[in-house]
């Protein structure tokens, strides 16, 4: 995914916007998807697509899961191994970190950012 993004944005002026709403346990393309696991987090924007993704992830990881969601139910189970990562706790086989690491390695952007909150 990182290579495709780099091919599209490399050498072109771009501004990226992400709306972090109705964060579901699986990709929206999955037919078996469940109710959102996280509340609406907000809107993020950056000239750096990787910094944008990292800011969105960090905001999600610090959010409280929606009660009754797959994530909240997983965390409530006494035998559940908490990975301290909402995405892995929802979908243990998730390897989202490797995509961001690879994107930084190929020069798509930086995972460092300064968050400016606007209200």
Please give the residue ranges for each predicted region.
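Extended, low-polarity segments enriched in aliphatic/aromatic residues
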Residues: 1-119
């Amino acid at each position: 995914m990182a290579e495709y993004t780099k091919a599209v944005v490399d050498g072109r002026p771009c501004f990226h916007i992400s709306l972090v709403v109705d964060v579901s346990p699986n990709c929206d393309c999955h037919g078996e998807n469940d109710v959102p696991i996280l509340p609406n987090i907000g809107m993020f924007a950056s000239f750096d697509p990787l910094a944008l993704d990292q800011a969105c992830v960090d905001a999600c990881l610090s959010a409280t899961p929606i009660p009754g969601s797959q994530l909240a139910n997983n965390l409530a189970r006494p035998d559940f191994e908490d990975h301290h990562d909402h995405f892995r706790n929802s979908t243990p086989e998730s390897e989202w970190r490797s995509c961001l690491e690879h994107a930084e390695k190929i020069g798509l952007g930086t995972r460092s950012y300064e968050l400016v909150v606007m209200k």
